[in-house]
């Protein structure tokens, strides 16, 4: 309690008549201090706040204006061409961000791996893998729990409107394509193409020769020997004449090598990891390459600093254009509306509950200021619907806004934007069970477990591009024998849900970077000491060896997380 409060209580105990006067003096002093603080805030703090949060305020304002503008223009029923013209500024933002994704993934991953020793890389890689697996499994569990409790698929699917067409992809081919894309045969081609199995039909003709008694002719006719009599020869001839020759032709679907447009981010990440590890192992011989990629990464981030000022304008027109493209807003109601609500509740529980809780339990810090620091990245994710396109903004928010170590962001974010898809995993598991519900298909525990495992694995293969979850959902449905054509029932709202799950993906990547940084403080400090104090010679080396030995002794009883 303040001294004014103490003097007030003293006056209360000494003289009852002075109590009211003391209370009045105390209130006047507090009011004066509050008035002075408000005056100071209006002159300095508000200006500093606006300057520090200009990007966030502009982006939030762009979202509000975009939604309002879209609903104001909907009564005019713009044509598809007019909507595309209207959305052109948003398309420019997408192209700018996608232009930076390729050099940013390669440069950040190479520098991140080259700046760490092999032991530190191994420990941080294990922590990242555990974090990715734990959060993805939790997301799948939340999705299954929500769709089981709310049961949005109750009723018939006859009232649901179908949109589009879904290509059926065998599960084995999809996972083989994932592994193939990890090892691109041509790095130049990997910059704009991915391997994708395609299918063609061929006519197969088979000739079947059967005898009249249904057996194949085969060795039933043999050349006559001298011991055979005329009767046996006649029997063989009769049997040969009684054979039937049948030609059967049928079509067969066969897999053939193909490709799909888009950056093979997974293959580039794998190559960049290996290349960065090799450069880091070369020590001083690899310094030139390390400096090159570090300078490239710095140049890309400066370009991001320029493009970020255009982001609010692009987000405004992206969101407005998508709302204008919706033919019927009524699809958000009824049975499909319950499905949409179920997905939103699940994503909110994971993004607003589980991920902040993990951050708090590991770092013992309030997670919500951290989430506020990446708000612009989250809004950009909502506008672009692509975690890869949001990657430049995410780097800037974490490194410059929140001060996360660059070695961690370069190590974690490119991989996270490719394989850590919490929102996608939750969505795929929930959507698969929803489709089972609308078909009145009862799933047993084994099938639900299969959906969980398949959704977790398929989310890893979902590239950070818009609506990739619809493609990987085919794998989940095929695993339990559900009709893949029923994916068309939920396409009408996928454009909206895709933005929400992309925000969840970006939030999961960002919190993962903060968690791994907190757990890797000892390795980062030792690595920084080795890089900044090399001139101390042998005494320094012996001191660092002792520090490493003590670190291993303390860390031997610790878990990876």
Swiss-Prot record:
Glycosylated position list: 213, 229, 236
Main location: membrane
Residues bearing PTM Phosphoserine: 2
Keyword Cell membrane set for record: yes
InterPro entries per record: DAACS, Na-dicarboxylate_symporter, Na-dicarboxylate_symporter_CS, Na:dicarbo_symporter_sf
Subcellular location: Cell membrane
Residues reported in the UniProt entry to bind Na(+) 1: 416, 420, 505, 509
Keywords: Amino-acid transport, Cell membrane, Chloride, Glycoprotein, Membrane, Metal-binding, Phosphoprotein, Potassium, Sodium, Symport, Transmembrane, Transmembrane helix, Transport
Cytoplasmic membrane side: 1-52
SUPFAM superfamilies, sorted: Proton glutamate symport protein (SSF118215)
Molecular function per GO: glutamate:sodium symporter activity; high-affinity L-glutamate transmembrane transporter activity; L-aspartate transmembrane transporter activity; L-glutamate transmembrane transporter activity; metal ion binding; monoatomic anion transmembrane transporter activity; neutral L-amino acid transmembrane transporter activity
Topology within the bilayer: Multi-pass membrane protein
GO annotation, cellular component aspect: glutamatergic synapse; Golgi apparatus; membrane; membrane protein complex; parallel fiber to Purkinje cell synapse; plasma membrane; postsynaptic membrane; presynaptic membrane
Naturally occurring in which organism (per UniProt): Rattus norvegicus (Rat)
Residues annotated for L-aspartate binding in this entry: 385-387, 424, 465-469, 498, 505
GO biological process: one example: establishment of localization in cell
Protein name: Excitatory amino acid transporter 4
Record field: catalytic activity: K(+)(in) + L-glutamate(out) + 3 Na(+)(out) + H(+)(out) = K(+)(out) + L-glutamate(in) + 3 Na(+)(in) + H(+)(in); K(+)(in) + L-aspartate(out) + 3 Na(+)(out) + H(+)(out) = K(+)(out) + L-aspartate(in) + 3 Na(+)(in) + H(+)(in); D-aspartate(out) + K(+)(in) + 3 Na(+)(out) + H(+)(out) = D-aspartate(in) + K(+)(out) + 3 Na(+)(in) + H(+)(in)
Family label: Belongs to the dicarboxylate/amino acid:cation symporter (DAACS) (TC 2.A.23) family. SLC1A6 subfamily.
UniProt intramembrane annotation: 368-398, 448-481
